[in-house]
């Protein structure tokens, strides 16, 4: 038993530290999504691994209770935007790390055009310039739900928002 105040690790480290192919892939993901370190890649990998493990378990079982669990797992993945509407449990087995990394607040800020680069998006989130439905969120790894996606914007009192509005007015 662990200590109740100490949360368990949210990621698993790779089984072998010096695998060139894995390191190359992790470096590509770190560069593409502007991650701080490989731990963020490992967190996403662990999330995908747990979703796929649960899906394999549920596909192998057939009972009334597992039917509810299937709905819950699919509902969670659809709400978070990792899977599309109408997805089946078999689709969970096809999930990749990039499916999870695309749902991060940092990535969506860049995709919506609020930042020029993913690194700038990360900095804007950390410095408190980004709000989600009016609430300041300073965690770039926050998984944005499907309903919150269009509510991403600048924090109302952000000096960054004022600078961008001034630049747009000057044009």
From Swiss-Prot:
<protein>
    <recommendedName>
        <fullName>Small ribosomal subunit protein uS4</fullName>
    </recommendedName>
</protein>
<dbReference type="GO" id="GO:0006412">
    <property type="term" value="P:translation"/>
</dbReference>
<comment type="subunit">
    <text>Part of the 30S ribosomal subunit. Contacts protein S5. The interaction surface between S4 and S5 is involved in control of translational fidelity.</text>
</comment>
<keyword id="KW-0699">rRNA-binding</keyword>
<dbReference type="GO" id="GO:0042274">
    <property type="term" value="P:ribosomal small subunit biogenesis"/>
</dbReference>
<comment type="function">
    <text>With S5 and S12 plays an important role in translational accuracy.</text>
</comment>
<keyword id="KW-0689">Ribosomal protein</keyword>
<dbReference type="Pfam" id="PF00163">
    <property type="entry name" value="Ribosomal_S4"/>
</dbReference>
<dbReference type="InterPro" id="IPR022802">
    <property type="entry name" value="Ribosomal_uS4_arc"/>
</dbReference>
<dbReference type="InterPro" id="IPR002942">
    <property type="entry name" value="S4_RNA-bd"/>
</dbReference>
<feature type="domain" description="S4 RNA-binding">
    <location>
        <begin position="103"/>
        <end position="167"/>
    </location>
</feature>
<dbReference type="Pfam" id="PF01479">
    <property type="entry name" value="S4"/>
</dbReference>
<dbReference type="GO" id="GO:0003735">
    <property type="term" value="F:structural constituent of ribosome"/>
</dbReference>
<dbReference type="InterPro" id="IPR018079">
    <property type="entry name" value="Ribosomal_uS4_CS"/>
</dbReference>
<comment type="function">
    <text>One of the primary rRNA binding proteins, it binds directly to 16S rRNA where it nucleates assembly of the body of the 30S subunit.</text>
</comment>
<dbReference type="GO" id="GO:0015935">
    <property type="term" value="C:small ribosomal subunit"/>
</dbReference>
<keyword id="KW-0694">RNA-binding</keyword>
<dbReference type="GO" id="GO:0019843">
    <property type="term" value="F:rRNA binding"/>
</dbReference>
<dbReference type="InterPro" id="IPR001912">
    <property type="entry name" value="Ribosomal_uS4_N"/>
</dbReference>
<keyword id="KW-0687">Ribonucleoprotein</keyword>
<dbReference type="InterPro" id="IPR005710">
    <property type="entry name" value="Ribosomal_uS4_euk/arc"/>
</dbReference>
<dbReference type="InterPro" id="IPR036986">
    <property type="entry name" value="S4_RNA-bd_sf"/>
</dbReference>
<comment type="similarity">
    <text>Belongs to the universal ribosomal protein uS4 family.</text>
</comment>
<dbReference type="InterPro" id="IPR022801">
    <property type="entry name" value="Ribosomal_uS4"/>
</dbReference>
């Amino acid at each position: 038993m662990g200590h109740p105040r100490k949360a368990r690790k949210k990621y698993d480290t790779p089984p072998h530290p010096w695998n060139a192919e894995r390191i190359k892939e992790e470096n590509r993901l770190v560069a593409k999504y502007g991650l701080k370190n490989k731990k963020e890649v490992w967190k996403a990998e662990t999330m995908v691994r747990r979703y796929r493990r649960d899906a394999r378990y549920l596909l192998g079982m057939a009972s009334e209770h597992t039917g509810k669990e299937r709905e819950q797992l699919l509902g969670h993945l659809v709400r978070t935007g990792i899977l599309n509407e109408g997805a089946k449990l078999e689709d969970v087995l096809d999930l990749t790390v990039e499916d999870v990394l695309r749902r991060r607040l940092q990535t969506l800020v860049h995709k919506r055009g609020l930042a020029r680069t993913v690194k700038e998006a990360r900095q804007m989130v950390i410095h408190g310039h980004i709000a989600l439905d009016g609430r300041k969120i300073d965690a770039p790894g926050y998984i944005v739900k499907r309903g919150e996606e269009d509510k991403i914007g600048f924090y109302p009192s952000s000096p960054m928002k004022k600078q961008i509005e001034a630049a747009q007015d000057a044009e």
